[in-house]
């Protein structure tokens, strides 16, 4: 089994390299406490394993092929392949590790594709650092690469076999005599089965495990201290992951000269200050506890108070009638990762990009949690599923949440009560317990619950409606109703604001699509003891406006939220809503609706707009949004 041991050695060698890289990173940027160091290494291990598996996989494949092609030439080719391959990767990896270590102290985040934007003028490097320093650094780097490469080249050697190719031959003979009794084809079958198992293990390591989410930067985030999270991230993984996600978004949606686009965008009156009259106040206090429930897919088509089936959501309908109901709110996007950013950061959605999947950009966004944390709130996010899905974990920890809880943080017996994790009913019970615990701390709190049961395959522990899909939404409504009824009996109710809305709309009935604005018409409800009185707000708005509207009511500055508006402010004089999906943009204002089809580059559906004003406005908005997103660093 010499070849097996060789693969284990090479795999462990990559892990050792990444461990040493962490030590170098700490030596330059500061060592954490002993306990924190072990936590960083442990939580960062999945990405280290992933990169080690990526780099070992080609060698695994080459050795497998070597079992079937054993000649003197193949031995020589095997040796050269291994040496060139490892030396090339070591050069790249060591360069990434060293640069990441050095720039972190100045940049405060991991090396990613953003760094490439600073190489437009490489001649400036020696000019700024000096040729002497550059030459010395280059020679030192070459020496390090040569030394580490030599160590890696020694891995195939053993006391009995001197080369990778020779080891293949020896292993074949060993397997031939001991495992297969001289039968050539049985020998090959044994080897193939063994290597298939090894390949499966490498695949699982590359993937990041057997969970629903694949390996991503956010899966190693575990702390409210960003230095600990950044230290856990494998710099090689971070760099190539961001490289795959990187696009030049500044070139997207280029419809106008920048000055004209800015002029049109400014006419839309985004990011205005809150100017509230006494009658504009919705709350009994400026510092309520805040609970935001983001409902999976629960769009207006299935909610009675908007335009849906009144049999499906009686509890939501009742809350809308007794609380504050924003009756003309529209979702910005079509997916959870995008709708989440829209809601919590007041940031627009894009047809071809998920900002949440780009940690280098999502981590610098403003957020409701960050704003409330800055004025003394304790912040917590709860989700019954995999919190690493689409980089949610890194986004929430980076933007102000003290704790981000996912399925692994809840009792094992509850983790499969839904196909996606912990069902909504059980999560509502956990939420109640966490609220009770926060109440004992004596400080204001902001909690967020993202539900999951109202999602395909629509399997829920509830049976009231025959339509399986509608029954899943009825279960969400039932769970929410039980939670509200229970929470209403506690002293905490009086000082709590509860905001309820979905992450995006829903395709129901099945023939509805993005070209029908009813699909993304969503309910937005404010309830709780901190709500002054019931009210219907019929102003056109987006879910991106939740952030500025909430902070405006609380007297907290929201000037960082460039694309969010306070719907209750006297400055909100041009109500409009925008929605995007991969094939187009929708723009809605008091004059009607314009839907721009990106495939045909033409207006697909429109109410009268003789001058094309709405089309011009949505194009200018998207041009501004892309330019802003491209600049996020």
Annotate the PLM regions.
Residues 2-248:
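Transmembrane and membrane-interface helices of multi-pass
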Residues 3, 36, 76, 124, ...:
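Exposed alpha-helical structural elements
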Residues 44, 48, 128, 154-155, ...:
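Residues that form generic nucleotide/phosphate-binding pockets
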Residues 63-65, 473, 587:
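Short alpha-helical linear motifs
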Residues 174, 215, 530-633:
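Membrane-interface soluble catalytic domains
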Residues 209-562, 571-575, 581-582:
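Soluble catalytic regions of membrane-associated enzymes that act on cell-envelope
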């Amino acid at each position: 089994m010499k070849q097996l041991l060789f693969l284990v050695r090479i795999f462990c060698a990559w892990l050792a390299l990444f461990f040493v890289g962490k030590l170098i990173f700490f030596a330059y940027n500061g060592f954490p406490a002993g306990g924190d160091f072990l936590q960083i290494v442990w939580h960062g291990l999945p990405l280290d394993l992933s990169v080690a598996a990526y780099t070992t996989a080609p060698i695994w494949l080459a050795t497998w092929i070597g079992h079937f092609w054993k000649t003197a030439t193949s031995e020589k080719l095997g040796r050269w392949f291994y040496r060139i391959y490892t030396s090339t990767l070591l050069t790249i990896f060591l360069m990434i590790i060293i640069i990441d270590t050095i720039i972190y102290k100045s940049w405060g985040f991991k090396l990613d594709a953003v760094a490439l934007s600073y190489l437009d003028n490489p001649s400036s490097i020696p000019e700024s650092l000096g040729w002497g320093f550059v030459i010395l650094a280059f020679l030192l780097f070459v020496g390090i690469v040569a030394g580490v490469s030599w160590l890696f080249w020694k891995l195939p050697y053993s006391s009995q076999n001197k080369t990778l190719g020779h080891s293949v031959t020896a292993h074949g003979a060993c397997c031939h005599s001991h495992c297969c009794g001289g039968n050539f084809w049985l020998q090959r079958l044994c080897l193939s089965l063994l290597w298939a198992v090894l390949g499966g293990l490498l695949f699982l390591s590359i993937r990041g495990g057997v969970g629903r989410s694949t390996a991503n930067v956010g899966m190693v985030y575990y702390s409210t201290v960003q230095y600990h999270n950044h230290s856990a991230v494998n710099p090689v993984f971070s760099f190539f992951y961001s490289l795959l996600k990187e696009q030049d978004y500044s070139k997207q949606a280029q419809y106008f000269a920048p000055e004209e686009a800015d002029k049109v965008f400014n006419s839309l009156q985004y990011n205005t200050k809150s100017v509230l009259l006494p009658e504009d106040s919705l709350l009994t206090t400026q510092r309520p506890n805040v609970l935001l429930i983001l409902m999976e897919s629960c769009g207006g088509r299935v909610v009675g108070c908007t335009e849906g089936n009144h049999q499906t959501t009686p509890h939501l309908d009742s809350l809308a009638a007794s609380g504050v109901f924003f009756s003309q709110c529209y979702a910005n996007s079509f997916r959870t990762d995008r709708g989440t950013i829209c809601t919590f950061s007041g940031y627009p959605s894009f047809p071809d990009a998920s900002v949440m999947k780009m940690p280098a950009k999502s981590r610098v966004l403003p957020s409701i949690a960050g704003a409330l944390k800055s004025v003394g709130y304790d912040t917590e996010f709860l989700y019954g599923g995999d919190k690493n899905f689409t980089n949610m974990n890194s986004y929430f920890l980076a933007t102000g949440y003290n704790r981000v809880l996912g399925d692994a943080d809840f009792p094992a017996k509850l983790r499969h009560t839904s196909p996606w994790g912990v069902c909504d009913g059980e999560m509502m019970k956990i939420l109640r317990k966490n609220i009770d615990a926060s109440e004992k701390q004596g400080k204001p709190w902001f909690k967020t619950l993202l539900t999951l049961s109202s999602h395909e395959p629509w399997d829920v522990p509830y049976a009231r409606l025959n339509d399986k899909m509608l029954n899943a939404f009825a279960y969400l409504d039932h769970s929410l109703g039980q939670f509200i009824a229970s929470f209403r009996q506690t002293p905490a109710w009086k000082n709590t604001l509860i905001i309820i809305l979905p992450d995006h709309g829903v395709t129901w009935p099945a023939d509805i699509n993005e070209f029908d604005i009813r699909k993304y018409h969503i309910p937005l409800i404010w309830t709780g003891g901190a709500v002054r009185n019931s009210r219907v707000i019929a102003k056109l708005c987006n879910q991106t406006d939740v952030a500025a509207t909430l902070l405006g009511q609380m007297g907290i500055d929201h000037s960082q939220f460039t694309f969010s508006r306070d719907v209750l402010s006297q400055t909100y004089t041009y109500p409009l809503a925008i929605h995007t999906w991969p094939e187009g943009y929708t723009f809605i204002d008091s004059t009607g609706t314009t839907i721009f089809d990106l495939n045909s580059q033409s207006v697909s559906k429109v109410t009268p707009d003789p001058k094309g004003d709405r089309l011009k406005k949505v194009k200018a908005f998207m041009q501004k949004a892309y330019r802003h997103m491209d600049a996020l660093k």
